[in-house]
């Protein structure tokens, strides 16, 4: 999916994953990607920037993507054991986290807040003196869409936005673009998901 396919959908667009120091509190950005490796490269750069600037990251991702991110961070010189020990690099499994707040195929708002808020607060408490807010990446919405639960994914995006009205953090999420290839239906869900974000990130 190229940037032209997103025209008219996005409140704003920017190239790639913004460096963490350029993110703004309560921003909620989304990337629709075709190339997984390129996506992971950009996401890993975003996380590395946050860690090296004294920030803290909450990463909610699948096991395969957590491993791929860790490899990229180590290769780029990030001391992951140190980051983990200092709570700058907080990891949650996306599927296990979903299981904690999904009820009958739908995100339960109270369970969502009870699940995510403590980790956000922990990340905030781990920030360096000159860092104002943590950053987060969430892959749970992509899992819901991959399983055909598009409406539940949209509701989860809305819950993240509700959380952002209570806490300052910068959120990134991402979807494989081939999940929206189903003609008019796919285009409709693409527009609705995009509308829940402040930025669309393009390669």
Regions of interest found by a model, annotated:
Residues 1-203:
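Non-catalytic regulatory/interaction regions at protein termini and inter-domain linkers
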